[in-house]
């Protein structure tokens, strides 16, 4: 749609959490010029931060699918836990597999297109992870980046103290208190395809 409504304009994308994964699943991923992902992974439980792993496993991979099985969908609004979510989506999220193509959505995409579409993305890609994000650990971020074989990928790891904070976590990057410290990192990448010299954090070495 963006290409149709704004012909000739570059298409840049920012994706948080599964949104970063979704950027590589669309048929139009090859149109993306630059991509910034924040805490982007696909919830493989062994990649969760060790100190939170079993609590998170119980919440997302046991309790959530159990409630969904009982109710026929996940009543997130009523529980104050996310939004109401279809049963098929919950089953896909909660499946404990290290390979995306083994999930039901991954199998469906592979059956339709013959391959996983991540490799079609050729964007300059910056994956940002925060050290106190129990979902976006280095293994989790790298697991997803490994699917983007057609793009040039950089992984920036930021500690809260790098920006004078005690905590940031998984959900706070795009909240207004971080407008002056974190948002410019994403903006610089979208505008120039590179990090400014004074960017907080460190690049994660990639094999």
Kindly give the residue locations of the regions a language model identified.
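Active-site nucleophile elbow and catalytic-triad environment of alpha/beta-hydrolase enzymes
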Residues: 96-117
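Acidic beta-to-alpha connecting loop that harbors the catalytic carboxylate
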Residues: 131-133, 171
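Short alpha-helix in the alpha/beta-hydrolase fold that links the catalytic acid
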Residues: 123, 136-147
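Short, conserved loop/helix-junction motifs that constitute active-site signature segments
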Residues: 29-30, 118-122, 147-150
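Conserved acidic catalytic loop of the alpha/beta-hydrolase fold
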Residues: 1-10
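Short beta-strand/loop motif that positions the catalytic acidic residue
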Residues: 121, 127-129
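Catalytic active-site module of serine/aspartate enzymes centered on a nucleophile-bearing elbow/loop
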Residues: 157-207
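Alpha/beta-hydrolase-fold enzymes
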Residues: 14-103
